[in-house]
Amino acid sequence: MKKLTVYLATTNPHKVEEIKMIAPEWMEILPSPEKIEVVEDGETFLENSVKKAVVYGKKLKHPVMADDSGLVIYSLGGFPGVMSARFMEEHSYKEKMRTILKMLEGKDRRAAFVCSATFFDPVENTLISVEDRVEGRIANEIRGTGGFGYDPFFIPDGYDKTFGEIPHLKEKISHRSKAFRKLFSVLEKILESENR
């Protein structure tokens, strides 16, 4: 299979590294050569992921992958959801987590990290989107320094440590890992059928 070069529609170096680590051999992942402003005004992770991929793809005139992901806390009606990155945007994630911990006092702590991943090729006009999640709960305190974002207070189901305490496992079980592996699988099937 011919190697496919894909730009990631992000300037977040953590995301680039996380996706590069799980990318198949037939795909070369590159960070976007330029920062492109995309207003993430969708009501769902899927809408934002598709919008990012299409805007980046049309501007770069090259295949791109984008994602939108975030934390969904069930007892807070899905908050912060698509606003995960923009919630208290001027504050650190540590401050955001402290605020959420206060909001959760006396409430159910079930939560999920959700990721929608999209591939867009503007030349072939191919658009593929998938979504996956990892279920878990919010810890009673911030624990661990690994990972990024809300990782230090999210405990995935089946574990007693936060993603911040087990960053080496996160690449295998995270929402982003699951969504992108699913996307790679769909892409591989399409590419194999085109090469026949």
From Swiss-Prot:
It comes from Thermotoga maritima (strain ATCC 43589 / DSM 3109 / JCM 10099 / NBRC 100826 / MSB8). It comes from the Bacteria. Homodimer. The active site is at residue 68. This is dITP/XTP pyrophosphatase. GO terms for biological process: nucleoside triphosphate catabolic process; nucleotide metabolic process; purine nucleoside triphosphate catabolic process. SUPFAM superfamilies: ITPase-like. Keywords: Hydrolase, Magnesium, Metal-binding, Nucleotide metabolism, Nucleotide-binding.
